Amino acid sequence: MSKAKFERNKPHVNVGTIGHVDHGKTTLTAALTRVCHEVWGTGESRAFDQIDNAPEERARGITIATSHVEYDSPTRHYAHVDCPGHADYVKNMITGAAQMDGAILVCSAADGPMPQTREHILLSRQVGVPFIVVFLNKADMVDDEELLELVEMEVRDLLSQYDFPGDDTPIITGSALMALEGKDDNEMGTTAVKKLVEALDDYIPEPERAIDQPFLMPIEDVFSISGRGTVVTGRVERGIIKVGDEVEIVGIRDTTKTTCTGVEMFRKLLDEGRAGENVGVLLRGTKRDDVERGQVLCVPGSIKPHTKFECEVYVLSKEEGGRHTPFFKGYRPQFYFRTTDVTGSCELPEGVEMVMPGDNVKMTVTLIAPIAMEDGLRFAIREGGRTVGAGVVAKIIE
């Protein structure tokens, strides 16, 4: 089978379904592929069972079962992730294995918000999912118009509780199963899912591409080249670095400023290095000992070093090669940010005495050295080089 050519002419947006078990996330995922294919003739229709037996992937040493599907509206290409189990969502969102530009919260109109509805909204807030659109599913099972309105109000309240704009969030009511079966009684099937895609188009802004963001490169290695000066190497995470640009070196020690006097790739000199490329950057007047792995090179003022932050963490289970025993407050592992480990101590939330392998928990971490960080930065938790957890910065404290 020849692979279909990937069209790059449409903006690409990453989304995913979230919500309580059995509220219809996977059915809706299948319905989205079917409706886009039928209404706009784009993409391929995928069956429920093609999505439901999600393959397991490994991200940062953690096994996650995830299904990836794609579909197109007339103006956009969507890449959509769906997970079979609650634990997979927790891992997926914390590791950032599937970064979402927006989430589709699926909530059964017959049951209303349930524990995982709340937990997934909280996780979305903690890991920095910027936008949520709601699909009130199974509306064909609810005869009472007032009940639908009540559930809608509950969902809006829940979103507002976690600092999402509950009052302005688009909520589409319908039945994913009807849409999947090609039915559309009372516009609850195909029409509702088409409306959902239109809401995604309108409500989730086009994500800013990595190349348009301010330049940042984690430093992996440092060399001195006689007669030329100091070269730092790494993969450009975002933005563009041009010869002559002023840059800052941030993290671990005091922030310093310098100028890029050369960019090279595969021993060839370039005018610039771009997001995604592995480059060497020559720094003016910087000594070999002034820079180290774990610092970042960036646009001056674009990112600051911090030592204390609140984070959401997933602790690997024993089966995943994690710890065999719980940890308690005052636990001091290494936190691996981008290219280096920094020791830090953990404070647990009030009322939480210990954290078991396989749990997810919110905690406050204090590092022994500052790291260039911003909300949404992912990290691994390690003990002597072995990964025992994954986390994401939810809020910087100092």
Swiss-Prot record:
Location of this chain's protein in the cell: Cytoplasm
InterPro entries per UniProt: EF-Tu_GTP-bd (IPR041709), EF-Tu_GTPase (IPR050055), EFTu-like_2 (IPR004161), EFTU_2 (IPR033720), G_TR_CS (IPR031157), P-loop_NTPase (IPR027417), Small_GTP-bd (IPR005225), T_Tr_GTP-bd_dom (IPR000795)
Chain spans, region G4: 137-140
Superkingdom classification of source: Bacteria
GO molecular function: GTP binding; GTPase activity; guanosine tetraphosphate binding; translation elongation factor activity
EC code(s) of this entry: 3.6.5.3
Binding site for Mg(2+): T26
UniProt-annotated stretches for the region G1: 19-26
Catalytic activity line of the entry: GTP + H2O = GDP + phosphate + H(+)
Purpose of the protein: GTP hydrolase that promotes the GTP-dependent binding of aminoacyl-tRNA to the A-site of ribosomes during protein biosynthesis.
Name listed for the protein in its UniProt record: Elongation factor Tu
Organism (species): Marinobacter nauticus (strain ATCC 700491 / DSM 11845 / VT8) (Marinobacter aquaeolei)
Organism classification: Bacteria, Pseudomonadati, Pseudomonadota, Gammaproteobacteria, Pseudomonadales
